[in-house]
Amino acid sequence: MAFDKKLLEIVACPVCKGKLEFDKQAQTLNCKFDKLAFPITEGIPVLLENRAQPLS
């Protein structure tokens, strides 16, 4: 599923307020600074720290 690039320009990491990157294969929004992956569920980003997974 494609992710809206315009939305990607305005969303931010809820932890550090930094830029997020879309991982098409994993269907996540990733914060490289905090090393967290936020899931995208049914096309909706879930930007909750307690739902994020650590990036390896």
Curated annotation (Swiss-Prot):
SUPFAM superfamilies assigned: Trm112p-like (SSF158997)
Xref: InterPro entries: Trm112-like
Gene Ontology cellular component list: cytosol
UniProt record similarity statement: Belongs to the UPF0434 family.
UniProt protein name: UPF0434 protein Sden_2197
